[in-house]
């Protein structure tokens, strides 16, 4: 269950699981030709691996092609995905060749529209995913 604290919305792992399942359903219903998946570092890595496992689509071996689904956690300002497209524009003939999927899409603030999204987020709250929590131990606190 999403926990609201001030202007922040904290998602649980269960919330993420629901969003990933919803995104997987949209991916299979889209009939997109997807051969592999690539997660944008850092926020897109975990959802990308989850989608890869659920759908049995491999993670890319390093080469991004028009058949690669690019996954990120959120498309808020859209700048990350827009910059990614600019970086790879020589690889893609048209913007619609770039297949993108996100857990949350904020159309009211984004300059980029993802191909697929699990949830359209209309709140101005900042979304905090479980992998972004500051309550984890730092690497120095672990004893081997």
Regions found by a protein language model. Name each.
Residues 1-144:
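PRPP-associated nucleotide enzymes
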């Amino acid at each position: 269950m999403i926990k609201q604290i001030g202007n922040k919305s904290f998602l649980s792992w269960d919330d993420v699981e629901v969003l990933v399942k919803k995104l997987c359903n949209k991916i299979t219903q889209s009939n997109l030709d997807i051969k592999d998946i690539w997660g944008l570092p850092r926020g897109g890595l975990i959802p990308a691996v989850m989608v890869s496992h659920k759908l049995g689509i491999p993670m890319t071996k390093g080469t991004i092609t028009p058949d690669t689904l690019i996954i990120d956690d959120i498309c808020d300002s859209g700048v990350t995905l827009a910059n990614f497209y600019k970086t790879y524009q020589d690889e893609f003939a048209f913007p619609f060749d770039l297949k993108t999927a996100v857990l949350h899409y904020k159309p009211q603030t984004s300059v980029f529209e993802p191909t697929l999204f699990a949830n359209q987020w209309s709140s101005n709250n900042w979304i905090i995913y479980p992998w972004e929590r500051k309550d984890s131990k730092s690497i120095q606190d672990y004893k081997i």
